[in-house]
Amino acid sequence: AAAPLLCAGITPYSPLRHWHAGPGKKVGIVGIGGLGHMGIKLAHAMGAHVVAFTTSESKRDAARALGADEVVVSRNEDEMAAHVKSFDFILNTVAAPHNLDAFTTLLKRDGTMTLVGAPATPHPSPEVFNLIFRRRSIAGSMIGGIPETQEMLDFCAEHGIVADIELIRADQINEAWERMVKGDVKYRFVIDSSTLAG
């Protein structure tokens, strides 16, 4: 389960490192999919207090097993309100358009939310005053260079971090695609190369 680290590992690792996730920092991870599950594992290993956000009550136990200290169901207004103005950093991995304001209001003054999920259509425009009044930032990040990728691989080796995968045969690729579109994949599919026609 090391191959997906070159995408699903470095994509969350780079912004977590850049924005100094670590001891004494409260870090939110929005989404518990291919990128989000790695974000939780990495932020936990970096020593941050990790809060996972999901729209699904059924993912609470999975998020905790990945290393989340807390899990918030983002559809629950009371759970969201309990975290207003408390995050140093939020990594948003969701690749579907959604209300960014629901998460920027959770940032402390000078907090940053970094987007790594790329939706096919734009997010609704954020409320500017929500950013201005507390000097909050919305940023973006995409993978990393060779030295940072090597650093991430070394970090994962040191902490025993791998991507959670489902190994499939080459002849299952169409079925895997259909399942992925439906959201029926637990984190990452990996094709067993020994099943490729030679």
Please provide the spans of the model-predicted regions.
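Generic hydrophobic/aromatic pocket-lining and core-packing "Φ" positions
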Residues: 16, 40, 60, 100-103, ...
